[in-house]
Amino acid sequence: MVRKIAIYGKGGIGKSTTTQNTASAMAHFHNQRVMIHGCDPKADSTRMILGGKMQTTMMDTLREEGEEACMDLDNVMSTGFKDIKCVESGGPEPGVGCAGRGVITAITIMEHMKVYDDNDFVFFDVLGDVVCGGFAMPIRDGKAEEIYIVASGEMMALYAANNLCKGMVKYAEQSGVRLGGIICNSRNVDGEKELLEEFCKRIGTQMIHFVPRDNIVQKAEFNKRTVVDFDAECSQAHEYSELARKIIENDNFVIPDPMTMDELEEMVVSYGLMD
């Protein structure tokens, strides 16, 4: 039975990097069949899996060749490192239309063709901290059953994570979606791990893994590869392997209890981040 996971978080927090490295570790170390469906108009959710290749998006194919062309997987799906399948929703031309509609259209086509069913895990890498419209589709319509939020010990990252939890609460009962935990993508902020653990405790979830900051992530990206592909023996590759293992074995799924803005600020102040 395929497990569908949506990765959310503040813009620039490292969602795409975390998703691709975790997917690579899942396939390489844990022999899972993995697919990544990028839900960002930038279409950069699968680039490192494909060795730097920017693949043709579903919306580009739809615009240029029509819906029938989207039904041909050779046009819209690529296979990369460890046979990870890659699809990018894409979006409209800049300044025209709604990118969220592209997500809805792309997911609907993939479901119609039953593409997701041939995998153990499908990751939806979703644009920024947006919880409205098409970008909320994985939450709103139960397209993903599990949500993981990438955060750090910075105020805006926590603010975005808390807002995402508010969006989840709104749709959780109707869609069945649940929060699997917070992934800390460390920024080396003082007291970061303790702050994230406190935040998780307050909203009723777990910090599923603390991913330390390591320059090898940027080095691998510069070489257009994931860390696992670049150097599977390095310590950071094993951090992603641990994160992958914890996701595979996770059975702690909750409807979160978001904090008020006052509570969030009070907590952050107590850790000295707003001094």
From Swiss-Prot:
Quote the record's binding site residues for ATP: 9-16
Q: Which SUPFAM superfamilies match?
A: P-loop containing nucleoside triphosphate hydrolases
- HAMAP family per UniProt: NifH
Report what the Swiss-Prot or TrEMBL entry states about this protein's PTMs: The reversible ADP-ribosylation of Arg-101 inactivates the nitrogenase reductase and regulates nitrogenase activity.
Name-wise, this protein is Nitrogenase iron protein 1
Keyword set for this entry? 4Fe-4S, ADP-ribosylation, ATP-binding, Iron, Iron-sulfur, Metal-binding, Nitrogen fixation, Nucleotide-binding, Oxidoreductase
Give any GO molecular function from the UniProt entry: metal ion binding
Residues modified to ADP-ribosylarginine: 101
Taxonomic lineage of the native organism: Archaea, Methanobacteriati, Methanobacteriota, Methanomada group, Methanobacteria
Q: Would you identify the family this protein belongs to, as annotated?
A: Belongs to the NifH/BchL/ChlL family.
> Which organism does this sequence originate in?
Methanobacterium ivanovii
Binding positions for [4Fe-4S] cluster per the UniProt entry: 98, 132
Q: How does it assemble?
A: Homodimer.
Gene for this chain: nifH1
Its function, per the record, reads: The key enzymatic reactions in nitrogen fixation are catalyzed by the nitrogenase complex, which has 2 components: the iron protein and the molybdenum-iron protein.
Presence of keyword Metal-binding: yes
The record's comment on cofactor binding reads: Binds 1 [4Fe-4S] cluster per dimer.
Q: Which cofactor does it need?
A: [4Fe-4S] cluster
